[in-house]
């Protein structure tokens, strides 16, 4: 039994996943695709773990199978593994494995192997230590390779189910040939907020694919994610001439953070909104031209504004983490976090509400995954507390990307980002004595009742 109760939309998704999975299991085909589309912040991992755990308790269904859970980093692999422990504590009937457990030589019934996709598809020799060399003379004297694990599992007539997290990132031709074809799983569960592949009607009718989708509006109504994203882009910044664009971005972001902090305080909430600042991955290239890096610009600006760098600023770069302990807590004193791509996916900090994103130096690429870091709502179980504070139910992006370069994930026609703000001019006054009325077209006489 889970320690947490699912929301209604999550229960429905878990039920649909189970029904679709069982339908594909009965198919004679292999590599059947079950595509699970669910918005960022909807609890995809929560739903997946409950779906997998639920297979252990189905009446009249107890087939011999094991799972391989694919992520694209070691950190995310461990996060997914830890979620199982968090949700089910001692009630889990699945053994949770990592590459350290290769020594058992195979996957037992209901085992779940969590593994970093990059360690399986990398072409670099130093990163392919998990794969069996093509030259037998290069094989290690003892231990098991990934191929050994798969072969030994099948020798016991045990099926394998693959779960590919963030499948839109990983399902390349290389991944297909070097991993999926090797595993030859019975079912592949592709999980993504923005899947590249969605089964067509013919595939569904043939029984080789299924599609389960969660509506964004259901997630918003449950209070898990913010309603919309407000965006200020390069075009908006150029409408404010006479200011350095880098510093203008910081000024606008800080002002917004202060406004949000004031609103939280007025509600009696001990929530400190966080600004996350994404620096260019190629920030170092500015040094070669004699320019200050964006990191230097940001740090100098914050220092100039009297912000205590040691107490209020966190850094998250490869091999460098400063002031990151407990930063996810709503009451954390950290106001700013600088990062590159590290926080792009899988990092949860609901109090992160303002994203400042600088363009890449050489080849501008807007990282849509990063937007997901400001989508989560800060207090899902207290959504009614915010009914009169719409600003607190929004996320905010300040960027020097152009408007047509900004891509907000899972943005439907009903959920377009705010990019224009209209104001009435101060010199305009209401016109007294003018009234308006609404008359339906039927009453007006230009539209028939039919």
Feature map (PLM): residue ranges:
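A short hydrophobic beta-strand->loop->alpha-helix junction that borders the nucleotide-binding pocket
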Residues: 68-74, 99-102, 117-118
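SF2 helicase motor core recognition
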Residues: 123, 338-353, 372-374, 385
């Amino acid at each position: 039994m889970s320690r947490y109760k699912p929301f209604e939309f999550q229960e429905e998704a878990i039920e649909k996943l189970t029904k679709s999975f069982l339908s594909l299991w009965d198919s004679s085909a292999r590599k059947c695709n079950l595509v699970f589309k669910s918005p960022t912040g909807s609890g995809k991992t929560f739903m997946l773990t409950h779906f997998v755990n639920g297979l252990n308790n189905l009446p009249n269904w107890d087939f011999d199978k094991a799972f391989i859970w694919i992520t694209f980093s070691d950190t995310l692999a461990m996060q997914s593994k830890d979620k199982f422990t968090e949700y089910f504590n001692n009630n889990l009937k699945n053994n949770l494995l990592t590459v350290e457990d290769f020594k058992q030589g195979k996957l037992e019934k209901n085992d779940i192997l969590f593994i970093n996709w990059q360690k399986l598809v990398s072409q670099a020799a130093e990163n392919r230590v998990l794969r069996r060399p093509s030259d037998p003379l290069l094989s290690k004297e003892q231990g098991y390779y990934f191929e050994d694990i798969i072969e030994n599992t099948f020798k016991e007539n045990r099926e394998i189910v693959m779960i590919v997290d963030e499948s839109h990132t990983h399902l390349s031709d290389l991944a297909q040939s070097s991993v999926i074809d090797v595993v030859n799983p019975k079912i592949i569960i592709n999980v993504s907020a923005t899947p590249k592949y969605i089964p067509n009607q013919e595939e569904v009718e043939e029984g080789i694919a299924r599609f389960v989708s969660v509506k964004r509006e259901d997630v918003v109504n449950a209070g898990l994610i913010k309603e919309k994203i407000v965006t200020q882009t390069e075009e908006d910044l150029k409408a404010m001439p006479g200011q350095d664009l880098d510093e203008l971005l910081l000024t606008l972001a800080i002002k917004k953070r202060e406004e949000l902090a004031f609103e939280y305080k007025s509600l009696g909430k001990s929530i400190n909104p966080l600004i996350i600042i994404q620096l260019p991955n190629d920030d170092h290239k500015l040094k070669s031209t004699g320019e200050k890096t964006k990191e230097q610009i940001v740090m100098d600006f914050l220092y100039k504004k009297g912000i205590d760098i040691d107490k209020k600023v966190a850094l998250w770069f490869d091999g460098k983490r400063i002031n990151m302990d407990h930063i996810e807590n709503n009451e954390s004193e950290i106001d700013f976090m600088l990062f590159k791509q590290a926080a792009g996916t899988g990092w949860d900090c609901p109090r992160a509400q303002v994203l400042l994103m600088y363009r890449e130096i050489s080849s501008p690429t807007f990282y849509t995954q990063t937007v997901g870091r400001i989508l989560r709502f800060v207090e899902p179980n207290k959504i009614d507390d915010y009914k009169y504070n719409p600003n607190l139910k929004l996320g905010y992006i300040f960027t020097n990307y152009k408007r047509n370069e900004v891509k907000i994930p899972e943005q439907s026609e009903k959920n377009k980002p705010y990019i224009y703000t209209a104001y009435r001019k101060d010199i305009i006054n209401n016109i007294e004595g003018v009234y308006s009325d609404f008359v339906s077209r039927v009453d007006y006489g230009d539209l028939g009742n039919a």
